[in-house]
């Protein structure tokens, strides 16, 4: 049992070390070569994650295979808090993504999105001007509105209404159905006179760098994509959490074996 648990912890952490190398390399590459806001947003988290995994993996390998008890204890201490963090984040992700979905519009294939339908916590994130300015820049650089305009260049209004738009395209590239604007192209609409209950109608602009990027519908479209992504992450986290618990249990066995081995040596016994 001594050799099995220690060796297993060492092998598992060796694979974690191998995993950390491409993550760290990608983060460094992005920090040096990134040209867009979206790419630059990912470099520091990836570097931090890569370094963290590398340090944890080295501690696990050395602590278990070289029988360094204090290092293995530190490894288990960090692993315990990592399990708690992953568990809390998974629960949090399911809670904040439990609300909100697209609204079906009669006579149209696409859905529209209302910011009020999503959780208060998510709403506060996108209503923060600093956060949204960064997100908006990222959305604009992704050029999905430009691509939509190319795909629907020859569409009539009836053709456009048959398009199954993504949440981004529906929320950011066109005005709300409440505005009742006149269709010219997918990203160009003639405004109608009068007042509108939906504040997004006043925010709509035909200029390509504006469109509806500041609209509540665009924020809602972003949250709908974020919601779907977080749910996938939460499911992956459950699997990851199970693996963490298994590795932690093996680490506890290895820690106990290290102590027994040290006790045996101090008393003139050999436990190998």
Curated annotation (Swiss-Prot):
InterPro entries: TET_plant, Tetraspanin/Peripherin. Keywords: Glycoprotein, Membrane, Transmembrane, Transmembrane helix. It is found in: Membrane. Coiled coil: none annotated. It is a multi-pass membrane protein. The chain crosses the membrane at residues 8-28, 46-66, 76-96, 235-255. One of its GO terms (biological process) is auxin-activated signaling pathway. Its main location: membrane. The keyword Acyltransferase does not apply. Pfam families: Tetraspanin. Residues 29-45, 97-234 are extracellular. Glycans are attached at residues 154, 190. GO terms for cellular component: membrane. Residues 1-7, 67-75, 256-272 are cytoplasmic. Belongs to the tetraspanin (TM4SF) family. PANTHER family: TETRASPANIN-8-RELATED (PTHR32191). May be involved in the regulation of cell differentiation. This is Tetraspanin-9. The gene is TET9.
């Amino acid at each position: 049992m001594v050799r099995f648990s220690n060796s297993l912890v060492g092998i598992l952490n060796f694979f974690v070390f191998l995993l950390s190398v491409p993550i760290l390399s990608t983060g460094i590459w992005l920090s040096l070569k990134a040209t867009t806001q979206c790419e630059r947003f990912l470099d520091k988290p990836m570097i931090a994650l890569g370094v963290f995994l590398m340090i944890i993996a080295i501690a696990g390998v050395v602590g278990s295979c070289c029988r360094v008890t204090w290092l293995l204890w530190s490894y288990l201490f960090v692993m315990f808090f990592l399990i708690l963090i992953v568990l809390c984040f998974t629960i949090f992700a399911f809670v904040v993504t439990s609300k909100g979905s697209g609204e079906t519009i009669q006579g149209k294939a696409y859905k529209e999105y209302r910011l009020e339908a999503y959780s208060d916590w998510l709403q506060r994130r996108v209503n923060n001007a600093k956060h949204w300015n960064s997100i908006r820049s990222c959305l604009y650089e992704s050029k999905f509105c430009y691509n939509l305009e190319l795909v629907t260049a020859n569409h009539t209004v009836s053709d456009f209404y048959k398009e199954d738009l993504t949440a981004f395209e529906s929320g950011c590239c066109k005005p709300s159905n409440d505005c009742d604007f006149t269709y010219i192209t997918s990203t160009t609409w003639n405004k109608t006179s009068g007042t509108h209950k939906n504040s997004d109608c006043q925010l709509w602009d035909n200029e390509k760098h504006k469109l509806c990027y500041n609209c509540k519908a665009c924020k809602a479209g972003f949250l709908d994509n974020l919601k779907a992504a977080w749910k996938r992450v939460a499911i992956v986290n459950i699997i990851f959490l199970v693996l963490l618990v298994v590795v932690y249990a093996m680490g506890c066995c290895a820690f106990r074996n290290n102590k027994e081995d040290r006790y045996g040596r101090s008393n003139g016994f050999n436990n190998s």
